[in-house]
Amino acid sequence: MKRTYQPSKRKRRNSVGFRARMATKSGRNLLNRRRRHGRHSLIDL
């Protein structure tokens, strides 16, 4: 049986990467929230 999670770096970048976050208002909100918290990494890839 094929498993549900088939990792792909390209797919992951396109959905949760920095550019994807910057493309939407809620994504920008998320980045600003992480900046306010002082996160070492803004995106978790």
Swiss-Prot record:
GO BP field: translation
Residue ranges, compositional bias (Basic residues): 1-14, 31-45
Domain of life: Bacteria
Keyword Iron in record: no
GO molecular function: structural constituent of ribosome
Pfam families reported in the protein's UniProt record: Ribosomal_L34
Disordered, as annotated region: 1-45
InterPro entries in the cross-refs: Ribosomal_bL34, Ribosomal_bL34_CS
Key words of the record: Ribonucleoprotein, Ribosomal protein
Record's GO cellular component terms: ribonucleoprotein complex; ribosome
HAMAP family linked to this entry: Ribosomal_bL34
PANTHER family: LARGE RIBOSOMAL SUBUNIT PROTEIN BL34M, MITOCHONDRIAL RIBOSOMAL PROTEIN 34 FAMILY MEMBER
Protein family according to the UniProt entry: Belongs to the bacterial ribosomal protein bL34 family.
Protein name: Large ribosomal subunit protein bL34
